[in-house]
Amino acid sequence: MNSWTGLSEQAAIKSRQEHGANFLPEKKATPFWLLFLQQFKSLVVILLLLASLLSFVVAIVSGLRSNWNFNHDLIIEWVQPFIILLTVFANSLIGSIQEFKAQKSASALKSLTKSFTRVFRNGELISINVSEVVVGDIIFVDAGDIIPADGKLLQVNNLRCLESFLTGESTPVDKTIDSNEKATILEQTNLVFSGAQVVYGSGVFQVEAVGIKTQVGKIAKTVDDSVTKLSPLQQKLEKIGKWFSWFGLGLFAVVFLVQTALLGFDNFTNNWSIALIGAIALVVAIIPEGLVTFINVIFALSVQKLTKQKAIIKYLSVIETLGSVQIICTDKTGTLTQNQMKVVDHFCFNSTTQTDLARALCLCNNASISKDANKTGDPTEIALLEWKDRSQLDLKTYYRVYEKAFDSIRKLMTVVVQKDNRFIVIVKGAPDVLLPLCNNVQNEVKNIENLLDQSAGQGLRTLAVALKVLYKFDQNDQKQIDELENNLEFLGFVSLQDPPRKESKEAILACKKANITPIMITGDHLKTATVIAKELGILTLDNQAVLGSELDEKKILDYRVFARVTPQQKLAIVSAWKEAGFTVSVTGDGVNDAPALIKSDVGCCMGITGVDIAKDASDLIISDDNFATIVNGIEEGRKTFLTCKRVLLNLFLTSIAGTVVVLLGLFILGQVFKTNLLQQGHDFQVFSPTQLLIINLFVHGFPAVALAVQPVKEKLMVGSFSTKNLFYNRQGFDLIWQSLFLSFLTLLFYSLGIIYAINNRDLQTSGDLINRAGSTCGFFILGASAALNSLNLMVDKPLLMTNPWFFKLVWIGSLASILVFLLIIFINPLGLVFNVLQDLTNHPVLISYSFGGVILYMGMNEVVKLIRLGYGNI
């Protein structure tokens, strides 16, 4: 590559001070207060606010009736709407905090995926952050780059840029160094614009505008990367939440009318408020208030964990899809291998010397190594520069006048360099492509191919080089350009070693255990790919490897290694697996990988070697370019989905059980104990709305967070894994019987508590005290059982047969929730607020009922697990 002087560091600093920095103002983040207000658009929140409003109405009416005599009942009625409001605000606060963090994460993602560009400074080509580009800089770009600033071209080599974001035209623009005074600025082919994609060739330009002074800055067209994508699970939960809400609203109306009728219209002025409170309790019981909030928190925690593990997730939804990946189409170089290229062997043809071979490979090269050993460019080209002492190659006497960039279809790179009055055409690329273009190897082709096979058989990459000399060259002569890569003289080839990563073999084995099929797609020689694939365990049979040129699209699913593949073939491979119903992940780092990355379910771009276009097309950026990181991401995706299911099962358990208890309590037990409970006009609902809110939101909070951070003991990477079904393997059946059994226990001990109170001299004087005695038992049983149910969900075998230390975080979360209940029922001020019996310590029978119900629930689960353990999957 020709050298340009560029700016000095002092000149760059001065230019930045004069013309500004190279960045566009980011889209203004939504302020926290607005995020908080947006939470109130949710149907669930609206229903809870309505419940709170109606509770206020009941409290006001009760106050008017009692002449504002704030006895126990009136205090409870006034506290209740505030508790509902507190719950709504707490839930909304958690949601808004999560969205605020998501905004920050989107901003952090931009900093984690910073773009770099190559610039000439002080006569050296170096890599700098795009934001450090200044007016006057001389920039080098090639295929895959994003133009970092507006500028005028100084040199082009078949440069084509996609500028559709400015012009609306989807066809790439051929760039020249010639200006057209009659054309508009956007039609000037000698100009490049910030944000344009280089889809072919290379070029050098001088920066004329940066930041907001660029064309894209003037029209304020900023790209917002923080797009919100909902995963299939999140979409299901939104629908479930709406269904619960509408169902709850319908039941609210029915229950209010039916209960009013049961209580009697003759005393409607008193009975309507009792019926209304019962209907409100039912709505609160049905709606799983923490549904979306808990799941979003779990997803966010997983994203943070993966970021620390070098996997940068663009969208929360990617986590779930990762967990269901069945096919990984991976590159070889840099992903499965170390990407630490080194020339380990060479072959010089005829009279070619090592110096001739090295010089040709350095001249046909776009990498650079600065004086302070900073390396810029493709690892293969850097390895070629490092092979020999460049100071002995006399490279500065050659001046590049033309370049035909490498592409994955031709598999060649061509440059024309001038020395004195000679123009030397140098072509490097795949040996099997280059040899037929040479006219001096007719009788030696077989011998050369044998040598190449020997190198490939050792897992080495081979790169050949050839040249020819011209005494006249005109890059505007299309006929001469078309003939550049013909009638060449073969110089020889080099063999490069890029050993597999140590962790790749373990990751491949992990994939196979998890029923994930790893597939290698590479541009390398078939034998080289086969050797590496066998070493890593990807390939077991030779007939599972195929050349792209020999690929039969009907048999794509039969192969595990694809060599010498074009971008179109890579896209066809991905499409074939997707059409067969598989969830496919693809890795890529080049501009030509973008279609396959977009087509796949999870596109993974390499963070180190990946070009900007590939990063834009991907869902996940692997910042260490390591295949094992993808496998870690899949495992985390599986864990996240499993955790979400456990949290949902627990939420649905209390929603179903709570709804059954409230309904049966209103229409059956209420009638059974009507005489006792209606003394002094008191209602007879099993639970108050505030008790149900504590169970549905706060009690689930501790176990939900614990489940999210607790390492799982399941062998997640053994066997297939599906995220299509929310519940499977008995889970739906278990949810139903557990909910009904818990409902039965809650109602049973509620009834026993009432019977005890009726027969107790201290309690029988008040219908309210009688109801609270039963309600306290039911409240503790439902809440504590739900808290401990998180432990049930962790293992299929009885808890008594497991080591508690394995799930210590879930134990802590569950016990923390139970502690909340104990505080409520044993501390008088809290008991008053949540309508439980205040002097519970004086009634050990009720305490035994409360703990007995929980023990029976957990005991039944242990018995069922024990039976299944002994008699198989029933």
Swiss-Prot record:
Gene: pacL
Entry keyword Cytoplasm: no
Active site: D331
Localization in the cell: Cell membrane
Extracellular side: 63-79, 258-275, 665-687, 750-770, 827-844
Official protein name in the record: Probable cation-transporting P-type ATPase
Topological domain spans for side Cytoplasmic: 1-41, 101-237, 294-644, 709-726, 791-803, 866-874
Its membrane topology: Multi-pass membrane protein
Spans traversing the lipid bilayer: 42-62, 80-100, 238-257, 276-293, 645-664, 688-708, 727-749, 771-790, 804-826, 845-865
Keyword annotations from UniProtKB, A to Z: ATP-binding, Cell membrane, Magnesium, Membrane, Metal-binding, Nucleotide-binding, Phosphoprotein, Translocase, Transmembrane, Transmembrane helix
Origin species: Mycoplasma genitalium (strain ATCC 33530 / DSM 19775 / NCTC 10195 / G37) (Mycoplasmoides genitalium)
